[in-house]
């Protein structure tokens, strides 16, 4: 009789890996990246390349010289993804040295301080963006106009749709909203006066990325739909209450809402684990986004809303737990 050889568990292996998910999200970002190249040209290429290179370099250096890890993590795609998302949250005319500082905060403070991928409390790219917004508010809120393919530091700047909405609320003058691009232009990324951050300009490109990630089962619908749906409903009620508030379609197509809801809030590490927890998380992000956009110091509130709810993710996970195997379901 032959020997029975039993290997260590687990005996069943799936194809879902860190590398697969990271590179899957990177692929999903390609439509938005190509659109940013089309609208911003060399500025977009410089910002994204600098951000990605700096994030990869800082992760390698911290692993090797500070944490002294023998195994590098730069090949798993997480540093590249952080660099891309950070670049997507920046103006296309931002000086290179400021981008490098943002990458240092994203990787050094937002990720490696907690022990690396899987341990971070906050989304690293948003940590980098928030740090730059506090340290360099003028540079981080000066947005170049679209269609300047050969421009970088000398690009013309203009008012973004969110800035127009904010001005209408502050002044109480609803006619200011007439300056907004049409909903179709917002959807396609045609913002003639001021576009905003590179990755948030075209909702169509971001929705293509969402469709790809849902198809590949990289993410589920719960977080993006709950965020966008919450913002749509609340902004719709506000628009009905007063004409100084923009229509809900313009609100969800403007700023970083789509980018944040699809690519930032859905980060595995910093978002809740259960569908119910994800919906609670998404609704809270939507409410906070509306509050900060309309009554906060900055026109955009998506980044801060996500960071705030990142801090509450452990609490949500603690109180919204899946049923344990064998546990009796209460009737």
Report the location of each language-model feature:
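A generic, well-ordered mixed alpha/beta core segment in the N-terminal half of proteins
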Residues: 78-152
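Structural signature of hydrophobic alpha-helical transmembrane segments
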Residues: 42-54, 93-102, 192-203, 245-257
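Loop-to-transmembrane alpha-helix initiation sites
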Residues: 121-125, 201, 249-256, 278, ...
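Cytosolic-side transmembrane-helix boundaries in multi-pass membrane proteins
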Residues: 1-23, 65, 292-331
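Long hydrophobic alpha-helical segments that form multi-pass transmembrane helix bundles
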Residues: 122-207
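Membrane helical hairpin/interfacial module
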Residues: 34-86
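N-terminal signal-anchor module of multipass membrane proteins
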Residues: 1-56, 329
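C-terminal ends of transmembrane helices
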Residues: 9, 57-69, 107-118, 208-217, ...
């Amino acid at each position: 009789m032959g020997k029975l050889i039993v290997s260590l568990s687990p005996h069943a292996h799936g194809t879902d890996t860190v590398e697969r998910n990271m590179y899957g999200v990177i692929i999903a970002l390609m439509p938005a990246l190509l659109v940013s190249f089309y609208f911003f040209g060399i500025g977009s290429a410089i910002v994204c390349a600098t951000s990605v290179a700096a994030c990869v370099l800082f992760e390698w250096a911290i692993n090797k010289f500070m944490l002294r890890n023998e195994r590098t993590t730069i090949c798993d795609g997480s540093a590249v993804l952080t660099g891309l998302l950070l670049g997507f949250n920046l103006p296309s005319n931002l000086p290179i040295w400021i981008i490098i500082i943002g990458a240092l905060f994203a990787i050094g403070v937002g990720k490696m301080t907690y022990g690396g991928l899987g341990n971070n409390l906050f989304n690293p790219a948003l940590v980098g963006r928030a740090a730059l917004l506090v340290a360099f508010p003028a540079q981080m809120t000066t947005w170049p106009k679209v269609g300047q393919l050969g421009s970088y530091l000398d690009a013309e700047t203009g008012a973004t749709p969110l800035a127009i909405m904010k001005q209408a609320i502050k002044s109480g003058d609803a006619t200011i909203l007439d300056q907004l691009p049409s909903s179709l232009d917002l959807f396609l990324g045609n913002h003639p006066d001021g576009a905003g951050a590179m990755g948030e300009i075209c909702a169509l490109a971001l929705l293509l990325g969402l469709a790809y990630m849902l198809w590949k089962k990289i993410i589920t619908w719960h977080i993006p739909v709950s965020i966008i749906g919450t913002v749509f409903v609340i902004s719709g009620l506000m628009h009905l209450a007063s004409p100084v508030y923009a229509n809900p379609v313009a609100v969800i197509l403007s700023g970083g809402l789509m980018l944040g809801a699809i690519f930032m809030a859905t980060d595995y590490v910093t978002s809740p684990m259960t569908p119910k927890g994800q919906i609670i998380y998404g609704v809270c992000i939507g409410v906070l986004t509306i509050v900060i956009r309309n009554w906060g110091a900055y026109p955009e509130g998506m980044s801060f809303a996500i960071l705030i709810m990142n801090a509450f993710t452990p609490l949500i996970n603690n109180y919204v737990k899946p049923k344990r195997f064998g546990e009796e379901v209460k009737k």
